From Swiss-Prot:
The lineage of its organism: Eukaryota, Metazoa, Ecdysozoa, Arthropoda, Hexapoda. It comes from the Eukaryota. Transmembrane segments: none annotated. Component of the larval cuticle. Keywords: Cuticle, Signal. GO terms for biological process: chitin-based cuticle development. It comes from Drosophila melanogaster. The keyword Signal applies. One of its GO terms (molecular function) is structural constituent of chitin-based larval cuticle. This is Cuticular protein 47Eg. Residues 1-16 form the signal peptide. Residues 31-97 form the Chitin-binding type R&R domain.
């Protein structure tokens, strides 16, 4: 299954720009981990490595490309039991807006009064 996901990601990157040519494509699939890397001639670089840590996967990766405005973009991330987390991004990712006060109060009420069955 993880091979299919990695292959689908590689295919999506390759088809995103039909004029791009693959300069490098590497993949390694093991029982306890996987790794792949793709480099295209249009500045797109994608790398990902996953390791089985006990019962859970820990996936680390990076992506980089040049935007249509000719600005270099890069993202490094980790995905584990805590979810997807951006480790670094250039340019920085936008900060999400604060949670509205009414919604925050509702969340606090729900946490204080869990549903009973």
């Amino acid at each position: 299954m993880k091979f299919f996901i990695a292959f689908a990601c590689l295919l999506a990157v390759a088809l995103a720009n039909e004029d791009a040519n693959v300069l490098r494509a590497e993949q390694q699939v093991n029982v306890d981990g996987f790794a792949y890397a793709v480099e295209l001639d249009n500045s797109v670089n994608v790398q990902q490595k996953g390791d089985l840590n006990g019962e859970e996967w820990v996936v680390k990766g990076s992506q980089s490309w040049t935007s249509p405005e000719n600005v270099p973009v890069s993202i490094q991330y980790i995905a584990d039991a805590n979810g997807y987390q951006v480790v670094s991004a250039n340019p920085p990712l936008p900060t999400p807006p604060p949670i509205p006060e009414a919604i925050q109060r509702s969340l606090e009420y729900i946490a204080a009064h869990p549903p009973s069955q």
